[in-house]
From Swiss-Prot:
Classification via NCBIfam families: PRK05309.1, uS11_bact
Similarity comment text for this entry: Belongs to the universal ribosomal protein uS11 family.
GO molecular function, one term: structural constituent of ribosome
Organism: Thermosynechococcus vestitus (strain NIES-2133 / IAM M-273 / BP-1)
A Gene Ontology term for the protein's cellular component: ribosome
Gene3D superfamilies, sorted: Ribosomal protein S11
Protein name: Small ribosomal subunit protein uS11
Domain of life: Bacteria
Membrane-crossing residue ranges in chain numbering: none
Amino acid sequence: MAPSAKRSGPRKQKRNVPSGVAHIQSTFNNTIVSITDPNGEVIAWASAGSSGFKGAKKGTPFAAQTAADNAARRAIDQGMRQIEVMVSGPGSGRETAIRALQAAGLEITLIRDVTPIPHNGCRPPKRRRV
């Protein structure tokens, strides 16, 4: 049996980042929360799927709240205090994720909706008939 290999690469260091940007991407199927430093380097992230939800439950507001709480806790461990929030997408977890970030102890300085809106770009998919 081969001996267990020791990890010798550079470990991820804890950085002290007092302020940053929280990007919330909320779709109908999932919610992804990425917290970055002001330059855009990701410090912490979480999604409804990584928080333990599967299938249709990933699209719920409660799953978005849990994902935002997990990401906020990891960012606070790195020393984050203030964040700007960029919200993108039409999902149901948008407001809940913002409230969860605030409840976790992060001070929100700005909320901006950055959902991409086409100026009559590509043809959208046909309407669903259910």
